[in-house]
Amino acid sequence: MKFKYILGLLSAAAMSVALAGAASAQDKTVKIGAIYPLSGNAASAGVHGKAAIETAIDIINNAHPELGNLPLAKNAGLAGLGGAKIEAIFADNQGSPAVGQNQALRLITEEKVVALNGAYQSGITLTTSAISEKYGIPYVAGESVAASLTERGFKWFFRVTPIASDFAKIYLDFLKDMKAGGQKIDNIALVHENTEYGTSVANVITGMFKDNGLSIALDISYSANTTDVQSQVLQLKDKKPDVVIMISYTSDAILYAKTMQALDYKPPLMMADNAGFSDPSLIKTVGKLVQGVFNRSSFSIGPPGSPTFLINEMYKKRSGDDLDDTAARMMQGFFVLCDAIDRAGSTAPDKIQAALKATDLKPDQLIMGYKGVKFDDKGQNILASGLVIQLQDGENYVPVWPKDKAKTAPVLPYKGW
């Protein structure tokens, strides 16, 4: 009987060791949920985002000392977790807030991810991050800009990108500079899709411009899934605004470009709020129809041999395109999350949360042109910043404002085609 008892203890000990070994082996891979539109109207942005995150994983999991001070590039894997590798579990939100919410739930409860990343469209980031908040799982958004996302009192949500108010201030200052140079900006039209992204950004721009003496003469709201924007373009043609600001995703931005050409409408100055106008598929499809459009950005590819140049080469092998601002912000958000996991030295949610709160990255540790990454109590990066770019050379955006970051001067009036 005593022998059987000892044998039982030994068997139990062996089982514990085996389970511990299995857990240790499992810890060699850290799973992060990445929720993006891999199908639907915004699929191009999601597919490019997937390529950006896969590039980031390559950089993290393999040693890339040539990338300078970029965190996690020097060594293979997460040093804080004994060289553990990162694995992204991609989930297609299909451009739907409800689908995105279900995917977030699945990733947390079934895939057992330690954190979430995504989800491009602000309206989907809104629903997916609500699930992570409920379950106490860290969520990092690298690209969603709706101001409301960091106004919910959430404790598990962190955003790396500048927000709508940051970009609205950039637009305001840029237009004032253009006015000082003789450009008329008295009447401004906002054209925006009607989800959380378009509506919230339009509201922020309207409020800021009004407070600074600029008039929004025309506000045009439309469905991002629309197949006909003739009436909206005819409104613009009739009202003749001095400035048109487009807040659009990819398919609707392409539709507007084609319709403007068909109806022979060109505003004197046209600006875009990133999103669809930064998508490489738009540039390939209708880039020749929107020459001279201004856009906002926080990213530019550096000279040969620089970290951003080398990263772009890696990304281009996966995607076939150069790294655009949106995909770069997605990549930056993923880097920030992985850096926090590494510093946490743990996959425990509260440890990752604490590491995110303590984040203090410097400009030379980033691929974006931010002043750094440091989160306030709401989870917003207070060091995020941006600039104005213009499509001047076929398919290439170039920085044009502010002057200290410009590679060339702005060209006016808007050329179109």
Task: Kindly give the residue locations of the regions a language model identified.
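Sec/Tat signal peptide C-region and signal peptidase I cleavage site
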Residues: 17-25
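Extracytosolic ligand-binding ectodomains
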Residues: 2-13, 25-417
